Swiss-Prot record:
Membership in a protein family: Belongs to the universal ribosomal protein uL18 family.
CDD domains named among the record's database cross-references: Ribosomal_L18_L5e
Biological processes, Gene Ontology terms: translation
Keyword Cell division (UniProt): no
Top-rank taxon, per record: Bacteria
Name this polypeptide is given: Large ribosomal subunit protein uL18
Keywords attached to this entry: Ribonucleoprotein, Ribosomal protein, RNA-binding, rRNA-binding
NCBIfam families, alphabetized: L18_bact
């Protein structure tokens, strides 16, 4: 198995281990984060109904404008601020953070810090 495949398997193991323990509710939805090499995505998910309450990513025009590259910490900070703004518009102030198996470092940490600075608590 290649080293890339080993990393992917390890991330999926971390993801399932964490997902067993956390769930989102209407009062406190799950803030799910996914990152690829070029983009970062965030969703607020109510696990009782399986519905996405709000989402933000670097694919959206308002987040991506002014960025020369969308796969860095600056872009993750903008996505964190955008998801916090959308959550506050829907009167959601508390969330459960789901790092989706990714290490809490770099872009994931930047997104979480920006969401906290803009009004979300977790």
């Amino acid at each position: 198995m290649s080293s890339l495949a080993q990393k992917q398997v390890a991330r999926l193991k971390r993801q399932t281990r964490v997902r067993k323990k956390i769930t989102g509710s209407p009062a406190r939805p799950r803030l799910n984060v996914f990152k690829s090499a070029r983009h970062i995505y965030a969703q607020l998910i109510d696990d009782t109904t399986g519905a996405t309450l709000a989402s933000a990513s670097t694919l959206l025009g308002d987040v991506a404008e002014g960025l020369s590259y969308t796969g860095n910490i600056e872009a993750a900070t903008k996505v964190g601020a955008a998801i916090a703004k959308k959550a506050l518009e829907k009167e959601i102030t508390a969330v459960v953070f789901d790092r989706n198996g990714f290490l809490y470092h770099g872009r994931i940490k930047a997104l979480a810090d920006a969401a906290r600075e803009n009004g979300l608590s977790f």
